[in-house]
Curated annotation (Swiss-Prot):
ANK repeats lie at residues 50-79, 83-112. Induction: By Notch signaling via a CBF1/Su(H)/Lag-1 (CSL)-dependent pathway. Belongs to the NRARP family. PROSITE patterns: ANK_REP_REGION, ANK_REPEAT. It holds the Pfam family Ank_2. The keyword Glycosyltransferase does not apply. The gene is nrarp. Keywords: ANK repeat, Developmental protein, Notch signaling pathway, Repeat, Transcription, Transcription regulation. SMART domains: ANK. One of its GO terms (molecular function) is enzyme inhibitor activity. This is Notch-regulated ankyrin repeat-containing protein. Disulfide bonds: none annotated. Transmembrane segments: none annotated.
Length: 114
């Protein structure tokens, strides 16, 4: 691991920066952060103070681009939030048809590859 990667990994505010990028819908910043965190002990599926993962928040916001990015970097589409809702439930309830279709496709693909 390079010195730059080690310093990124040891930043105490990494989780806050990650969640802030998600809340702001900043795909470019989030992509950069996730790329730099690939060699770290960083959990893309961690829950924020509202009981949501970054994926849940991106679905709530209707941000398909961010949803795709998070899934690419390992976000678990089957995780439930503190209310028991998966990303698919949230997308359907919010009327985000593009995200619903994407999540169904990903779920179908991931279950057939097991």
């Amino acid at each position: 691991m390079s010195q730059a990667e080690m310093s990124t990994c040891s930043m105490p505010h990494t989780q806050r920066v990650f969640q802030e990028a998600v809340r702001n819908g900043n795909t470019k910043e989030l992509h950069s952060l996730l790329q730099n965190m690939t060699n770290c002990e960083f959990n893309v599926n961690s829950f924020g103070p509202e009981g949501q993962t970054a994926l849940h928040q991106s679905v709530i916001d209707g941000n398909l681009e961010l949803v795709k990015l998070l899934v690419k970097f390992g976000a678990d589409i089957r995780l439930a939030n503190r209310d028991g809702w998966s990303a698919l439930h949230i997308a359907a309830y919010g009327g985000h048809q593009d995200i619903v279709l994407y999540l169904i496709t990903k779920a179908k693909y991931s279950s057939s590859s097991r």
